[in-house]
Amino acid sequence: MARNEATVHSTTTQDRIDRIRELLPEIAQIGDDNLRTIVESIWEQVWRESDWQELGDIPKNPSAPAAPQRVENAWTLITHTRAVAQLSATSAETIKTLHGIDYDRDSLVALALLHDVSKVVEYVGTKDSIAKGHLGKLIQHGVYSAFLMWQHGLSTEMVHGVIAHTPSSRILPQTHEALIVRYTDFLDTDSMLMDAGEELYLS
């Protein structure tokens, strides 16, 4: 993605990473130092490339501002990402405990944290109203996330998980981690849509 220097924030890289760690404490659950650093770096890069001054202001999607705000900062991209990370971890552990299906916890948490990271550059607007920008209109959701993951040397399985999480893709999940992230993403999103009286992804 060509970077417009006008969109680069005046804060330092470390300032942005510190803020990302504050907003997404689930990053600390990734035990592998290299993978944890890559997740932070990808979030920092898309933020730097965007017009958003504050990551916490980005709505989850265009429907989010109209959804009931029952708690502070409900239905932002950050709270959605945190919800998917937490739901994924607990779901995977339940399936492992009750059915014996193992999973890679680090890969699962990292995938959950990165599944919507490209929305930072796909959407433009304010915390009260967003729409797809140039990249979001021309490139399928998740493709830029996958590109950045390839650039940082993440596994084919993790890249697959990001591509397969969205109904925009014709690829269905082929790993347990990808399957769990897809369903927990739908669960959190449909919870918002049901509360807002809108059509569910499930339909």
Please tell me what each predicted stretch does:
Residues 131-137, 200-203:
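A short alpha/beta connector and helix-capping loop motif
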Residues 103-109, 146-150, 154-203:
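Histidine/acidic-rich helix-loop-helix segments that form or flank divalent-metal centers
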Residues 84-87, 138-152:
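An active-site-proximal "capping" alpha-helix that borders the catalytic cofactor pocket
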Residues 119, 136-139:
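Active-site-proximal loop/helix of nucleotide/amide-processing enzymes and allied scaffolds
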Residues 127-132, 141-145, 165:
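Short, local alpha-helical segments
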Residues 2-131:
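Acidic/His-rich, divalent-metal-binding segments that scaffold phosphate/diphosphate chemistry
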Residues 1-2, 203:
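Short intrinsically disordered terminal tails
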Residues 80, 115, 141, 165-166:
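Histidine-centered active-site/metal-ligand motif
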